[in-house]
Amino acid sequence: MYPEQLVAPMKAELANAGFTELTTPEAVEAFMKKPGTSMIVINSVCGCAAGTARPGVRKSLEHSKLPAHLGTVFAGVDKEAVNKAREYTLPYPPSSPAIAVFKDGNLVHFVERHHIEGRSADMIATHLKMVYDEL
């Protein structure tokens, strides 16, 4: 588990952009019961989360069509919440960072770490905006 003082700024990047921090399995379950479209970002301390995933996700919110609900869990910190979120992303293997988009609790799109690595924040933002347009 990472120290809170290390991850606090990384969590804040998404929380300040309007994401709800889901720190318990119960919070994830309640979030997933919300009707409509939702997105959960599985945040992490890795370089690709800092360099492209979080900036790309934030930039994607500069769009006319967005998921109604935004949530985030943090790998290596909120273990039980992350495990619960990953139940909703099956059959995909565990991945962090990752971005999951849901409609009425059903997974409709999943961006795994290997789709994030080597791509710019702008590429991730553009991709997510196209996903939002399909919702």
UniProtKB/Swiss-Prot annotation:
InterPro entries reported for this sequence: BrxB/BrxA
Gene Ontology annotations of biological process type: cell redox homeostasis
Annotated signal peptide: none
UniProt cross-references to Pfam families, sorted A to Z: Disulph_isomer (PF06491)
Source species, domain of life: Bacteria
Family under the similarity heading: Belongs to the bacilliredoxin family.
NCBIfam families: YphP_YqiW
Name of this chain's protein: Bacilliredoxin CHU_0972
Species of provenance: Cytophaga hutchinsonii (strain ATCC 33406 / DSM 1761 / CIP 103989 / NBRC 15051 / NCIMB 9469 / D465)
